[in-house]
Curated annotation (Swiss-Prot):
GO terms for biological process: cellular respiration. Disulfide bonds: none annotated. It comes from the Bacteria. InterPro entries: COQ10-like, COQ10_START, START-like_dom_sf. It holds the Pfam family Polyketide_cyc. This is Ribosome association toxin RatA. Coiled coil: none annotated. Toxic component of a type II toxin-antitoxin (TA) system. Binds to 50S ribosomal subunits, preventing them from associating with 30S subunits to form 70S ribosomes. Its antitoxin is unknown. Transmembrane segments: none annotated. Keywords: Toxin-antitoxin system. Belongs to the ribosome association toxin RatA family. One of its GO terms (molecular function) is ubiquinone binding.
């Protein structure tokens, strides 16, 4: 199973970063490779959402069930998509009132070797850039 772990120290609160990452409906506005998104279910502690990823003529949609702990974490597990397994999440560790560590940790395995060959590089690229994309988005939304 492949693993991705990316993190950044940002000058925004854990609460602010949680809200940006949890705003799935806005992903296509700023997340490279994201061509669409849809929130299917939502409550204060839970969300089911789909994200469409497109690049180089290849498009895939995956759906996750997300357990929400506001300002602390978003734990994700696969509902549907091109994966045999996808789990992990976002973690927000306060450093002080106006700074935090943002971390994305994922474990995944594609449903077939063919899908991995077609989509693996695109998914790796997307996940590698996600923390940076959210950091840039925070600067746009909350200011430098």
């Amino acid at each position: 199973m492949k693993q991705v772990s990316r993190s950044a120290l940002v000058s925004f609160s854990a609460e602010q970063m949680f809200h940006l990452v949890n705003d799935v409906a806005r992903y296509p506005e700023f997340l490279p490779g994201c061509s669409g998104s849809c929130v299917l279910e939502q409550s204060e502690a839970h969300m089911v959402a789909s994200v469409d990823v497109s690049k180089a003529g290849i498009s895939k949609t995956f759906t996750t069930s997300n357990q929400l702990t506001p300002g602390v974490s978003i734990a994700m597990s696969l509902v549907d998509g091109p994966f045999k397994t996808l789990r992990g999440g976002w973690f927000f560790t306060p450093l002080d009132e106006a700074a935090c560590k943002v971390e994305l940790r994922l474990e995944f395995e594609f449903s077939s070797k063919m899908i991995e060959l077609a989509f693996g590089k695109i998914f790796n690229e997307l996940t590698s850039n996600m923390v940076n994309a959210f950091t840039r988005r925070a600067k746009q939304v909350y200011g430098e």
